[in-house]
C-alpha cells in the first residue's frame, strides 16, 4: 500500500514529503472517502428537487477539489497531532514527520496554507451560500486526533463530520432540504444515517489493521472497543445500512434506478464484512479504500439515475 505512486515519482524531491502528508500521493483513491458522502448528499437533494442538470454538474465538480483540500488538511493536522503515537505503530513509522523529512513547524505552515486555500475556494465557488461547514471541517480536523487519546468512539465524530459536510454541500445547489416537505426531509435524514453507518463500518475495518499496535500503545479506537465480536457488530451495521437506504428510497418515492444502486451498495457492504479477514492488516486497508469507493459509488449512481430519469 505504501510503494511510491506515479504522483510522487513525478514531483520534485523537496515536495514529495508534503504530498505524502496529504496521503494523496500514496493513496489517490483516499480522496473519495471524503468526496463520496458529499456527492451522495448533493445527488439526493437534486433527485428529490428535480434540479437542472447544469446545477448538479457544477456543484459536483466544484466539491471535488474542495474535498481534496479539506481531506489533505485533515491528514496533515492528524499527522502533526499523532507524531508520538505514530512512532509506536509499525504502519505509520514511514510518515514524513516521524522520519524527520518535514519539521513540525513546516507541517503547521503547510496545514495553515491548506486551510486558507479551502476557505478561498469555498467562498469563490459559493459566494452566496452560508459556509457553515468551513469552521466545522477546520476545527473538527483538529479535535478528532485528540479524541483518540481519551475515547474509543472518536470514529463516530469523524463520520459525523462527513455527514455534516454533505448536508451543507447539498445546500449549495440552490435547494434547502431542511425546508422541504416532511417525507423528503425524512428521506434525507435516513440517507444521512446510512452514510454515517457505512463510514463507521469501513473505517472500523481499516482500524483493525493497527489493532495490535493500538492496544499496546493505549490508542483508542472502535476496533479496540469491539475486539472479540467485531464481525457480529459489523454485520449488524451492514443490515442497518441496507434498511436505511431502502427506507430512504421509499420515503422519497424513488424508482428502480435508486433501488438498484441502493441494493447493490448494501450487498457490497455485507460482502465486505463477510469476506474481510480482520487479522490481515493489508486486506483491511484494501477493503477500506476500495470498499468505501465501490459501495458509495453504487449509491451515488442510483441517485444519479433518479436525477436523469
From Swiss-Prot:
It is found in: Membrane. The keyword ATP-binding does not apply. Keywords: Membrane, Transferase, Transmembrane, Transmembrane helix. Pathway: Secondary metabolite biosynthesis. One of its GO terms (molecular function) is 4-hydroxybenzoate polyprenyltransferase activity. Disruption phenotype: Abolishes the production of Aspernidine A. It is an enzyme of class 2 (transferase). Its cofactor is Mg(2+). It comes from the Eukaryota. InterPro entries: Prenyltransferase, UbiA_prenyltransferase, UbiA_sf. Belongs to the UbiA prenyltransferase family. This is Prenyltransferase pkfE. It comes from Emericella nidulans (strain FGSC A4 / ATCC 38163 / CBS 112.46 / NRRL 194 / M139). The lineage of its organism: Eukaryota, Fungi, Dikarya, Ascomycota, Pezizomycotina.
Amino acid at each position: 500500500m505504501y510503494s511510491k505512486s506515479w504522483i510522487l515519482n513525478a514531483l520534485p524531491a523537496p515536495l514529495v514529503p508534503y504530498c505524502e502528508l496529504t496521503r494523496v500521493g500514496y493513496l489517490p483513491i483516499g480522496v473519495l472517502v471524503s468526496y463520496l458522502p458529499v456527492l451522495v448528499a448533493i445527488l439526493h437533494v437534486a433527485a428529490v428537487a428535480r434540479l437542472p442538470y447544469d446545477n448538479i454538474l457544477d456543484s459536483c465538480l466544484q466539491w471535488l477539489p474542495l474535498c481534496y483540500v479539506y481531506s489533505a488538511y485533515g491528514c496533515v493536522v492528524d499527522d502533526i497531532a499523532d507524531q508520538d503515537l505514530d512512532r509506536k505503530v509499525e504502519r505509520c513509522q514511514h510518515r514524513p514527520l516521524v522520519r524527520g523529512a518535514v519539521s513540525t513547524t513546516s507541517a503547521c505552515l503547510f496545514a495553515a496554507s491548506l486551510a486558507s486555500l479551502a476557505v478561498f475556494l469555498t467562498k469563490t465557488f459559493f459566494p452566496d451560500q452560508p459556509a457553515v461547514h468551513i469552521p466545522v471541517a477546520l476545527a473538527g480536523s483538529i479535535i478528532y486526533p485528540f479524541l483518540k487519546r481519551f475515547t474509543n468512539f472518536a470514529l463516530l465524530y469523524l463520520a459525523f463530520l462527513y455527514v455534516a459536510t454533505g448536508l451543507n454541500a447539498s445546500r449549495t445547489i440552490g435547494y434547502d432540504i431542511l425546508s422541504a416537505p416532511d417525507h423528503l426531509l425524512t428521506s434525507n435524514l435516513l440517507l444521512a444515517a446510512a452514510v454515517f453507518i457505512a463510514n463507521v463500518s469501513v473505517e472500523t475495518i481499516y482500524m483493525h489493521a493497527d489493532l495490535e499496535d493500538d492496544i499496546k500503545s493505549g490508542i483508542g479506537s472502535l476496533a479496540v472497543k469491539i475486539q472479540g465480536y467485531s464481525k457480529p457488530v459489523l454485520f449488524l451495521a451492514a443490515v442497518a445500512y441496507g434498511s436505511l437506504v431502502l427506507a430512504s428510497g421509499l420515503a422519497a418515492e424513488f424508482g428502480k434506478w435508486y433501488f438498484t444502486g441502493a441494493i447493490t451498495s448494501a450487498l457490497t457492504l455485507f460482502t465486505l464484512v463477510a469476506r474481510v479477514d480482520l487479522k490481515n492488516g493489508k486486506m483491511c486497508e484494501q477493503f477500506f479504500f476500495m470498499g468505501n469507493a465501490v459501495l458509495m459509488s453504487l449509491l451515488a449512481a442510483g441517485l444519479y439515475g433518479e436525477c436523469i430519469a
